[in-house]
Amino acid sequence: HSPESKITTIDRNPEMIGFAKENFAKFDNRQQITLLEGDAVDVLSTLTETYDFVFMDSAKSKYIVFLPEILKHLEVGGVVVLDDIFQGGDIAKDIMEVRRGQRTIYRGLQRLFDATLNNPGLTASLVPLGDGILMLRKNQAEIELPDVD
């Protein structure tokens, strides 16, 4: 029960958007949830608020693309949780052992790990829950990440 809390969610899938709207209409009596429709890469750059907590469950290869913009909007001391980061165990393999169709995801996740696990501006924790969670705590206002291009 957090009457002061606000939730902002981003989705681009029309079916999931419809499902979310139905549920928010039924259960969001205090109107604490804002649904932003569109691709996260476009929507994130339009945000003006800051956040204490961000949960990411999207295209795994895009986590590293979304992260710089998310960190801009995350309060110092805030936490980002990234879901399903072990890629069914593939992430621990050599890239040549990963199926060709999964290699873009593999590369994106490797870039994410390279950018975050030893970053002095972040505290990173890998949690072996389900298909893996990466928890990042923002320790300072400015976080330097390698270029994502």
Where are these regions (language model features)?
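S-adenosylmethionine/decaboxylated-SAM
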Residues: 1-149
